[in-house]
């Protein structure tokens, strides 16, 4: 009885200004509030893969939230590895221009498993998942908003690799639908 959403649930937009116009502190964010309500209403675990939360100093956290069946917050995780790349065809990403990286690996003890939390680009850094496995994680989560170009080439391979390397299950909700820019 666990539900996971993708990375950047509710705020998948291009551009710093558009993002900053939409986001709210966690205690004022309607998505965060509703996720807690749904967890309690249906007595399930709800994992917001991540959403954008403003930080002091003008930066933003790419933060995952995990709520228990009572609606209480179990833990949060801030994405550690920023997606700063230049892809073919002029596509460029600089998450570090907007986001501040997290600084800690997170493993949550749940009744059905010890769960490690990660977000998207973190998938490319096996040492994070190894640290979680060594801390007892049996289930690794990687909600994502992988780009089509890198996702098609790497997504399935890397999720399988993290599972095999650590003898763990991987749950990895990915984005769907259309972006504002039509892709």
Show which residues each predicted segment covers.
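Active-site catalytic loop in hydrolytic enzyme cores
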Residues: 25-27, 37, 55-135, 148-161
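An acidic, glycine-rich surface segment that forms the CoA-thioester-binding/catalytic face
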Residues: 27-44
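Short, intrinsically disordered, charge-balanced linker/junction segments flanking boundaries
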Residues: 1, 163, 179-183
């Amino acid at each position: 009885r666990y539900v996971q959403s993708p990375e950047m649930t509710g705020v998948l937009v291009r551009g710093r200004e558009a993002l900053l116009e939409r986001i709210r502190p966690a205690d004022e964010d309607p998505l965060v509030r509703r996720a807690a309500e749904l967890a309690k209403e249906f007595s399930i675990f709800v994992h917001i893969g991540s959403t954008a939360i403003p930080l002091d100093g003008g930066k933003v956290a790419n933060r995952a939230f995990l709520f228990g069946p009572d609606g209480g917050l179990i833990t949060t995780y801030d994405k550690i590895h920023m997606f700063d790349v230049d892809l073919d065809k002029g596509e460029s990403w600089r998450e570090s221009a907007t986001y501040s990286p997290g600084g800690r690996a997170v493993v949550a003890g749940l009744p059905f498993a010890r769960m490690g939390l990660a977000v998207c680009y973190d998938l490319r850094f096996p040492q994070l998942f190894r640290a979680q496995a060594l801390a007892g994680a049996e289930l690794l989560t990687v909600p994502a908003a992988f780009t089509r170009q890198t996702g098609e080439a790497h997504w399935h391979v890397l999720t399988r690799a993290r599972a095999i390397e650590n003898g763990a299950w991987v749950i990895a909700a990915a984005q769907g639908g259309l972006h504002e820019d039509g892709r």
